[in-house]
Amino acid sequence: MAGKRKNPADSWMPPRVYRGKAAYEFRTKENKAVRLCSLNETQASVWLAYEKAVGEEVRKNTFQSLADMFMTSPDFMDLSPETRKDYTKYSGKVLPVFGKTDPNKIKPEHIRRYMDQRGISSRTQANREKSFLSRVFRWGYERGYVERNPCQGVKQFKEVSRERYVTDEEYNAVYDVAADVVRAAMEIAYLCVARQSDVLSLGEEQISDLGIFIRQGKTGVKQIKAWTPRLRAATSLARALPLKPGIRSLFLIHQPSGSKYTRDGFNSRWREAKLAAQVKYPHLSIDFTFHDLKAKGISDLEGSLEEKQAISGHKNSRQTAIYDRKVKVVPVVGGQKN
């Protein structure tokens, strides 16, 4: 990733690009200066020249170079912070294997072998890392940096849908011992059937007389979650979270400094609550994730699968069915109502 520029006026420039005496210059991995274009050219022209120069470097170099270029591109920066962080994590697994290889020499069978080996320890992570590989290759193929995407046609492992349903007793056990920030986030996630990232990014401007406006980060669906007494109480609890003197926060779920919680920062508080609940309630199994609270919300909703889909914001009922985990009680023979 590119570091901060000494001159803020140069912050728009691509990585490894600098102002020369008469032209913008690109520094190769070998620290050789490659002329891009004159200093009179537009920023867009500099980026085009940069991508061409890096593309030529990729062709004669490695998958590491291709991945570096993707991860400093505008396309990468347009991804959500969580996705960028995940991709950075996945790159740490795949680059030791493919990093020094010419990307055009990586074939589908190489991807398959990686998947099979990685799948021994985690099939889910193997799928995620293959998706990262495919994203890098697709990005490079669209720009002419590689000849093909070797991930195409390589099957992912079948993932078994999670079936864990959080009971009211288990939910209340964690809520009982949790810090207020965790309590507020739990309630909003459950009541609004919302993802953790959408809860942590909630801003004060999303609160209205009608309810809480949420634009789902994954599907892009926009909804206003209508007020109930319980949702109002959760919002009030969040707004009462402590702040340092003189500080105001733009975020509903905020730290004392006023800044939003990162995923890792909040998960640390979440783990603390779960551990405390397990100690206080040893007869319960506190093995659920924060994301399972969304599934609990969908499972506890009344109505048909289609009605639950409309409330959840999923694009199809198949997605909603994955989250609908409560075991249905059905009549036996002779017990049906007329």
Q: Which residues are covered by each model-predicted region?
A:
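Basic/aromatic DNA-contact patch characteristic of tyrosine site-specific recombinases
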Residues: 1-65, 69, 105, 226
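Conserved tyrosine-mediated DNA breakage-rejoining catalytic core shared by Y-recombinases
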Residues: 14, 161, 165, 169-170, ...
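N-terminal core-binding DNA-recognition domain of tyrosine site-specific recombinases/integrases
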Residues: 35, 72-145, 260-265, 287-288
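Short basic/aromatic active-site micro-motif
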Residues: 106, 263, 283-302
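C-terminal catalytic core of tyrosine-transesterase DNA break-rejoin enzymes
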Residues: 124, 184-187, 191, 198, ...
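Basic, Lys/Arg- and aromatic-enriched nucleic-acid-binding interface segment
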Residues: 127, 146, 152-196, 200, ...
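Short, polar N-cap/turn motifs at the start of nucleic acid-interacting alpha helices
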Residues: 206-209, 304-324
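Active-site/catalytic core of tyrosine-dependent DNA strand-transfer enzymes
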Residues: 228-284, 297
